[in-house]
Structures are given as C-alpha cells and as structure tokens.
Amino acid sequence: MRPNTTIGKTITIDDLFRDGYKSVFIGAGLWKANAMHIKGESLGNVAFGIDYLANSKAFRLGDDVAVIGVGNSAMDCARTAIRNGARHVTCYARRDESCISASEYEVSYAKLEGVGFRFCKAPVEIREDGLICRDTVKGEDGKFTQVEGSETFYPHTGVIVSVSQGSESNLVKTTTGIETNQKGLLSVSEDGRTTREGVFAGGDAVMGARTVVEAVAVAKKVAVAMDEYMKSLPADTAADPYADIPVFQTPTSDVLAKQQL
C-alpha cells in the first residue's frame, strides 16, 4: 500500500504499467465540487458543499443559510448548518419537488429539523447578503427554462453550493486511451473494463453519485473481471537485465563513523 499518492499528477497510470502492474482499478469517486459559474461564487460567505462537509467549522455563514441543491449532499449540508447554529436553512432547486434527487429518508429528516425548500428557482447571482433567483417553468418536453424578468432577491447571510460533484480530470487527461461520456464519467463495459486495456473502473466515477453499498457491489463484480483478465495474460518471461550486477557493500568502518557523528 502506498498512501497519500495522487495518481494523475506526478505519477500516472502509464507509470504504473511501466513499473510492472498488470491491471489498474479506478475507484476515485466524485470528490471535486462542481461550480455553477455565476457571479458571486468566490465571495467569503459562500462555501462549496463538499468543502463545507469536510470542515464545516471553518466557515462563518451566519444564522440564515441558503443551500443550492436538493441531493443527498445538499441535505447533509443543510442539517449540518443547523447543527452549527443556523436558525434558518432553505434549500433551492431549479426544478419542481418531483425532481428531488435526495433519498426520501434524507428529505424527511431535513424537514423535521426545520429545513425549508424553494422549488423552481434558478440562482443567477450570489451577493454578500443573499442571492438572486429566476423562476423556472416546465415545458412540454419536460425541461425547465428560466423566466426572463422574474428575478427575485432572497436575503441570506451565507450560501452553500451543493450541485453535485465531478471527477478529477487529471486522471483521464494523463492516461492514454481512456474515454468518458458527456457527463465526464468513465465509459466502461458491463464488467468494468474501460476503453484502455488493463484499466478497470467502478463506483461514482462510472455511475455518478451513488451510495457506498452500490459502489462496493460493483467493485466486487469488477474484481472478478480483473482476476480473470490477469490470469489470461501470458507469463512474464523477460529476464531481469540487472540480475547479475555487483552489490555495493558499505564498509563497517564507515557505518561506525556515521553513528559516532
């Protein structure tokens, strides 16, 4: 095991194959916060959900917090904000209530703890004292569009942006032959094979944000495929070119001298 090592920066997947690994499993998950790219996201009263959950005590968001998003992470952020002293917490969603992605369990407990919800509101700007949203309407095609001229200002002391997470792009950018889909998730076969031979993947990096139970179930299935793949590879008969080189022996006197120093 080699901890505290980021693959995709100094060390790449290509380096792993060079150093003798026969297959690689990517289970990096989605730990990079997605931004909305609207004005005000860099203000001091704004936190990204994944950063807030990692160290909520580091943020000073006041007693009236807006949470943008209605997924499981957004529910965690809302409930954590209440535990940190916020008196009012409101979740905002671009679509209607039927489109909540959080589990019913998470939503029900958030409501019990006092979390409010505003639906069909699309944030267009964050300010130090709140956020500006436009109303959205559902079209015949099922898509929600913003209503021009419907802007409304909602006062808040702090804002948490929790609109899902993305994968770390360096892993893909530095590895030849790996393809992703339109959402930036890794493209794999049913048994977890990516488009690069010997590279397998599973979990959130493939399915999007899911539960730990689902990720573990997929990982077990992919592990079987990896084992079968490695067993199918021809035996490595290449001789070690440095097998017969001399081994330097440190003189005992040098060791004693260093110890005395």
Predicted regions span which residues?
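A conserved FAD-binding loop/helix module that cradles the flavin
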Residues: 202-232
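Rossmann-like dinucleotide-binding cores of NAD(P)H-dependent redox enzymes
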Residues: 1-3, 78-123, 234-252
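Cofactor-binding loop segments of dinucleotide-utilizing enzymes, especially the Rossmann-like FAD-
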Residues: 70, 93-96, 204
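Phosphate-coordination loops involved in phosphoryl transfer and adenosine-cofactor binding
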Residues: 4, 61-65, 86, 120, ...
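General small-molecule cofactor/ligand-binding pocket signal
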Residues: 2-4, 47, 116-118, 132, ...
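Rossmann-like NAD(P)H-binding beta-loop-alpha module
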Residues: 59-87
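Feature captures the FAD/FMN-dependent oxidoreductase FAD-binding
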Residues: 1-39, 124-133, 158-160, 165-171
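FAD-site-proximal beta/loop scaffold in flavoenzymes
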Residues: 42-62, 144-209
